[in-house]
Amino acid sequence: MQVKFPAMKLDRRSYEEQAVAVLGPQLFTDRRVLAVAPTGSGKTVMGSMLIANVKRWRRVLWLAHRTELIDQARTRLVNLGVQCGVQCAKYEQLHPEHVDRGAYCQVGSVQTIHRRGSLLDDVDLIVFDEAHRAMADTYQGIATAHPLAEVLGLTATPCRLDGRGLGDFFRVMNVLVKPSQLYGEDYLREPITYIEDEDEVMRGLRGAPTSGGDFTSASMRRAVDKPRLIGNVVRQAQKLAPGVPKVVYAATIEHSKKIASRFRKAGIAAAHLDGDTSAEDRARILDRLRDGTLEVVCNVDVLTEGWDLPALGAVVIARPTKSLSRLMHMIGRVQRAEGPRRKIVIDHGANCTRLQHIPGEDVAWTLEHGEPARPDAEVEPRLKTCIECSAMIRWTSAECPQCGAEQPTAKTRRQILDEQEAELVRLNRARFEKKRNELRKRAEKVAKERGLDMSWVERVVDGEMPRVP
């Protein structure tokens, strides 16, 4: 029997209610549905509303891979009146009062559930939070254990980290809302992006090895862990986003610690955290960032997913990546409408150029192929940097929307190659005509000496006669 707590009223945006109305019937028909919405759009709210409103599900299992996501989902579900228990070894130690094995909805760590089993028989609905991870063995093992369950995937980036699609598991994809719609309604803020150190990082990554679809730690370290580049990370953060809370994404733990140290030497309160940071220290550091006693937190793959600070003013991407999904998740941390009006992204990894991604644009995802095909950045570039302020702007922009500077006429690599080829043809033709004229003069001299007519001269010039002696 479903038991509900007294419900708390939530502000339901129209697209959230539309999503709930569509997803319930779609899950009944297609069984495995991938729901896509931008970071900060309220995917957890939409999933929770769906569970609270659809009555056919007697047993529900919500899976996430981080305690922050588990706590977020549990809170949303309880606020909507859903009886909810938690199954996560680490979370249970911190909040034993939230363990309720009899609750019909269990929010759990994918690792814990995979190890223990869900403690629920005949699960009717499984929710995969951050569903771009759905092809991992842990998620697949849980889905296999409940073959009759409907599966809802929630993600902002419907592809694996290597860019491949999720069509091997999900049967249909539903884009619930697009970034452009949320910017138009001021639910999200489109960030201003600045490109720094692009040429040097690009050179450092030529021929760099990859693993799992992204650069290896060693190749990233060689490209960006340099004193000059680290110093520039600090200088540009001070210049472009002074005084606002910032998160820095570093290449390695050592790289992150060096950046934090350089910030502190510049008189800016900064801290480092990584996967080995204790839960207590991590909470303390993030609380300090939230209350303003800390301005910068440097990290390595910790604050990429499942963490939000609406007051965040800037993200500094001090690492390269080949993964559009990873890049979008880093940028997504700074798109919430709360906090500073100007939201800043500083890209020190040449990522937007490499991936031809304009932060905030709508992406044409597909279920089968994941990331859309991107044009060659050298042949068909989509973006450039302002000649005055270094803000990233569209390739066709004649004026920078940030500083107003007039931009020189941009030429694509293809246009440049065409012009070079045309110039080469012109030069070759000029050389050819010069040689023909020299040959004509010599032939005319010989014809005059030998009493030959001009037809002989033309035949020599056209190559029909032996060379002129």
What residue ranges belong to the model's regions?
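Conserved pre-motif I regulatory segment
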Residues: 2-36
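Walker A/P-loop
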Residues: 29-50, 249
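Conserved Walker A/P-loop ATP-binding site and its immediately adjacent core
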Residues: 57-79
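Conserved helicase ATPase core of P-loop NTP-dependent helicases/translocases
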Residues: 91-100, 257-261, 268-300
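A short beta-strand element within the Helicase C-terminal
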Residues: 123-124, 296-299, 305-320, 326, ...
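Post-DEXD/H (motif II) to motif III coupling segment of the RecA-like Helicase ATP-binding lobe
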Residues: 132-193
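Conserved interdomain linker/interface between the two RecA-like ATPase lobes of SF2 helicase motors
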Residues: 173-247
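Conserved segment of the helicase C-terminal RecA-like domain
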Residues: 334-360
